[in-house]
Amino acid sequence: MAALNTAFGSEGIKNLGGEAVTVNDTTVDAGDLNILNNYTSGLVTASNVTTITGTLADVNASYAASATSGNAIAGLGDESVELTDTRVLATDLVTLNTDSSGTSGTIDASTISVIEGTAATLNTVYDGKVSAGSNGFTGL
């Protein structure tokens, strides 16, 4: 991933920007994945990715860019996620843990010390807590 972003960001390499790109890394930083997606108008295929790390905003942005064609990120949906935030909104956690807009994998939220939101949304977050396995939060 780093080499791809370096190549696209280099002033010495010309005429890049419309290519389809395949990410071979199994662990990626969501911010880096979003940067790569912004560098090209082609499809970024991330089907080899098994773990995504980063802030909740960056991770949700990666999943929001999910599509199978055009300027999008393809192949996401069942990755493990390791969040790096200490403070988040409950609604953003719910978005990430929704199969249609986030991951069905395990979400490591162990760095989070403050979750803000309504009682109903907080209940939804804690209802998504799992002790092991996938499709839920760990570390809460």
Spans of model-derived segments:
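General marker for long, soluble alpha-helical cores
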Residues: 1-140
